[in-house]
Amino acid sequence: MTLTKHEQDILLKELGPHVDTPAHIVETGLGAYHALFTAHPQYIIHFSRLEGHTIENVMQSEGIKHYARTLTEAIVHMLKEISNDAEVKKIAAQYGKDHTSRKVTKDEFMSGEPIFTKYFQNLVKDAEGKAAVEKFLKHVFPMMAAEI
């Protein structure tokens, strides 16, 4: 189920301060990946730019900044386009295909959804916004996973 315009507006407003500058975009993505790798450090090996890193040093690597930026940009792009189902599917498909070269299984990919949901909910203060985060990620994650 997709977001209503009202839910989209809440999320864009609440996430705005976290994605308003290139530095904030990277910082937001770093937080999401920190949450993912804390829960699943074994996933680090799936990222070519993180080769040789461990949970102890991955967050200081240059490679993680690339992944942090692209994750946040993809989420914001899908959120902004949520009323355009064809565009969201296109973005989700590309993001999902990007994971095929990482040898990520659908189950591994989907295991990130509750982690990212919790992380992004912590960035949102409004209870309605927290529910919208969950609704949004539960909508787009399966679309991305379908391409893996």
From Swiss-Prot:
Residues binding heme: 99
Entry keyword set: Heme, Iron, Metal-binding, Oxygen transport, Transport
Domain named Globin: residues: 2-148
Pfam families named in the record: Globin
Domain of life where this protein originates: Eukaryota
Function, as annotated: Oxygen binding protein.
Family: Belongs to the globin family.
Note: This globin lacks one of the heme-binding histidine residues found in most other globins (replaced by a tyrosine) but has an extreme oxygen-avidity and high oxidation resistance despite this change.
Protein name listed in UniProt: Globin-3
